[in-house]
Amino acid sequence: MSRDSLFVAGFVDISTCPKEDPSLNLDAQTWSRYLPLSTSIPLTVEHFSEAQVGWVTGLFSVAQGLFCTAVITAGEFLELLDSLYLECTVAQHSPKADLPRNPRAEVLHSWLPELSLSSVHPDLLGTKDEPGQVFHHISLCALGRRRGTVAVYGDSLAWVLSRFQSLSRDDVAMIATNALTPPSQAPEFTVKLGLLFAKAIDAGFISNRISTLKLDRQAAGISPATYLKASAVPQKLETAAPLNQPEGADTLIDSTMSGPGAPPAPQDDLIPVPRSAFLNMLESTVSRTHPANGDAPALLPFGRYNMVQVPKGLTPYVRPVGFIEPSDQDDYRYPSYTGPRPYDYFAPRQLCRNCCTSRPRKRAREDPEDEVSFPGEESTVFRKDLTDLSKSLAELQSEIRELKQMQNTPRPYPRPEHHYPAFDPLMYGLRPLPNPDKFPKEFICSDYFTKDESASKKPEVVHIPNPEQHVPACAAQPEVKLVEEKDVAPKQPRVVNASFQPKAETSKAATLQKLFCDEMLSKQ
């Protein structure tokens, strides 16, 4: 193992992988004219010219694409890798394969796992503006723009080339034979560490970086027996010893328990949710949930029986065993019809979301624009929401119990009956036709409308004053009788109408008749 160098190799372009930018396409026939390299080109970090860490010893055109080899010889950079290994948890994560520990290779696989080629734009090739040097440099980076450009680090070139299963034996032999010897000149690693830290921070916010590295590793055909950390997960080096539990005690703790006595959930299982959103989800869940032991389904109203159900009144009557009836009766009984009860027309009770279970919605919290959050730091707004949720947990549980009690309230169903009620034609939307034989022959009016008037109205007596002749009291009695007979004589019905007025002719005739009677009585 050499302490002064570290070898690296990998694809800088795979022809079968699609490119997002057309300028990233490398035509094998066009670029093969500038290969192989006549001299070594710089190997840098994140395309910083002052961050040169070694030399590129070869660029080779193979069946899959463009392959490169390089060597890291900068002493300052190698010392930086040794110091980073002592503080990096991911780098100290042991590889899955049975490989010896290599701190420098493990740090580079965790920090700079891919390669990036810097070359002339394809549009300038073959023109008068084509520069003399087509390939500028190759950089170690956190994630390349071309897919499949995964780097493999090792202590020897032969070991590094053996990790690529996509290379044939002829390609491996050709690369090992034609690789250049690095220059004896030491590379200039004078970059400020702040620039490297800034790039490392930016790499932490690349979307889907880990999954992309896994796909690039598969595209390059790299063997699992490498130090690549694309699928590594940070683990704690020290674990707390388990507490002593008595025999028979359950040592498993469910992290999803909730309540005052529940253990705290792990940090990875906590999802910050605003209070308004949590209440809305809880409300919709409770409204859709029906009690386990619900009431029986409601009875169907009249006129909604299907072909499977038996209509009321058409079920055969079964006589009880040992019961002797006084007379033979029909097999089918139709008890006396009783009017429908009020609850027969009630629809099935349903929970109204608008007026029963819905709670007054609170105004959703607006995200403050001036809220500043840093990577790895929990947001203040989410922390406040979690605190409020923990304080109001008892209130939410009480509300859930009240909603369940409302749903479990029994419905006022009628008591079961032993016999079906009588057949009701209205149940099928039919009305019984009247029997013409039972129609009355002549119109008979009831005294319902006139009994009050006849009881309250007294016989009307009209007295005609006669100053010339005195009428005795005994002689006035027939006059009253005549008036009563006149009023009672007609058999026609009388209807009290509030807007009706007596006819004037009737009053005049009664007056003349009375005058005639007075004349007859006076002559006797």
From Swiss-Prot:
SUPFAM superfamilies: Herpes virus serine proteinase, assemblin. Residues 268-287 are annotated as: Interaction with pAP. One of its GO terms (biological process) is viral release from host cell. GO terms for molecular function: identical protein binding; serine-type endopeptidase activity. Keywords: Host cytoplasm, Host nucleus, Hydrolase, Phosphoprotein, Protease, Serine protease, Viral capsid assembly, Viral release from host cell. The active site is at H47 (charge relay system), S116 (charge relay system), H137 (charge relay system). Residues 504-524 are annotated as: Interaction with major capsid protein. GO terms for cellular component: host cell cytoplasm; host cell nucleus. Residues 359-378 are annotated as: Disordered. Coiled coil: none annotated. A motif (Nuclear localization signal) lies at residues 359-365. It is an enzyme of class 3 (hydrolase). Region of interaction between pPR and pAP is called Amino conserved domain (ACD). The region of interaction with major capsid protein is called carboxyl conserved domain (CCD). Belongs to the herpesviridae capsid scaffolding protein family. This is Capsid scaffolding protein. It comes from Alcelaphine herpesvirus 1 (strain C500) (AlHV-1).
